[in-house]
Amino acid sequence: MNITKSAVISSLRDMKNFHDQLQGLYTANGMDLTQDVGRRNILMSLPMEHNLTKELKFVNEKVVNDGRTGKADIIITNGEIEEELECKLTSPHKSGAISLQSDFDTLERKGSLDYMYYIADRKFEKFVVIHFKGLTVDDFRSVSPGSRGKVQMKYSSAMSKAEVLVGKVKNSNHEKKRKIFEKIILTRRKANSRLTELQQRLEECSEKAEKKRENIIRMIDNCINTTEAKVFKLMRQFDDVTNKKPRFSFEFEDIQ
């Protein structure tokens, strides 16, 4: 299936227009559409599927928006290849946490599914859109009591199958590792500069000034030992972060 950033952005613009009209209707009748974003997102789910289908028709041979029980939200056909796409619309919780969910029974029955997750802010102005390819039950947590068959995504495995089309998804572990690596480089550079200076002082020092030479040599040894200890400690930190479960943050993109 062909899913482009431009197609997704066009669908978002149409969704925003529909949202504005719906919000106007609510306001005119003394209600606030954004008071309950969960209900708002339910109302916006069909426009999401409809508008994405409309845009995908420009880059695929055949695109059908069905969405009936037991049917995929969108079916995309190119040549003899027919692919299914599940679409989900969600928003951050009041705590800021973002939970991407799926229906366990559908996922278990299909074996593997592609997903489009539209994540909208409360005002429906900024978004993150992610296309996940070939997700399985292993990419989601187990069914919890009271979850009504819904399962939460495990970012640690699912993000390796993700293509972020709108906004950004950042792995905080990558950022931590980058900063540690920069510290290692800086530590090495400072040590090399200091060792160059000490080596020059040693070369310029008279052979007869034994105590002075011994002192410089001692400083060289101390510099090497101290640097290696610092680098070793940083490498341990780097390994610790590498072995930790990744944590992800979402950066929303304003759609005009």
Predicted regions and their residues:
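Nucleic-acid endonuclease domains
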Residues: M1-K71, G79, L89-Q256
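Active-site beta-strand-loop-beta-strand hairpin of nuclease catalytic cores
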Residues: I75-E84
